Amino acid sequence: IAGGEAIYAAGGGRCSLGFNVRSSSGATYALTAGHCTEIASTWYTNSGQTSLLGTRAGTSFPGNDYGLIRHSNASAADGRVYLYNGSYRDITGAGNAYVGQTVQRSGSTTGLHSGRVTGLNATVNYGGGDIVSGLIQTNVCAEPGDSGGALFAGSTALGLTSGGSGNCRTGGTT
């Protein structure tokens, strides 16, 4: 499974995988949104929940918005992002976004969308006391289910989809 593809929570709910990562000890994890991993500890790669992705290894939300799922099968951890046109992009490193940078976002509801970074270190109040700070702000659209998906530029990982306003028909901020 690659970045941007759908992941399914035990008991219901769908998010998107951001990037597959490896620890210094060689363990592989799926990186996604923390508001996703907080709702379930077991995750699957299919909606019928017959193909196990793995179990939650950690969640940081609110404050931050990221979570780690330990892969049950390390060979399933694809180092690419799915571009929703039948092809994939190799991700070879991580970097820091900058204002004006052209970026792409891959997610399981709306696929691949492009735009620019419009701000850094943004803070968003999602309500109910859920405040997340240190975010990259873009003019790339997103919709529910895109959460956790990959934000990247070329072969460089930049971040994960946390949330946004608007949608991919009329546009929005993510």
UniProtKB/Swiss-Prot annotation:
GO terms for molecular function: serine-type endopeptidase activity. One of its GO terms (biological process) is proteolysis. It comes from the Bacteria. Disulfide bonds join 15-36, 141-168. InterPro entries: Pept_S1A_streptogrisin, Peptidase_S1_PA, Peptidase_S1_PA_chymotrypsin, Trypsin_dom, TRYPSIN_HIS, TRYPSIN_SER. Coiled coil: none annotated. Its main location: secreted. Keywords: Disulfide bond, Hydrolase, Protease, Secreted, Serine protease. The active site is at residues 35, 65, 147. It holds the Pfam family Trypsin. Its EC number is 3.4.21.-. The keyword Secreted applies. It is found in: Secreted. One of its GO terms (cellular component) is extracellular region. Broad substrate specificity. Belongs to the peptidase S1 family. This is Serine protease 2. It comes from Streptomyces fradiae. The lineage of its organism: Bacteria, Bacillati, Actinomycetota, Actinomycetes, Kitasatosporales.
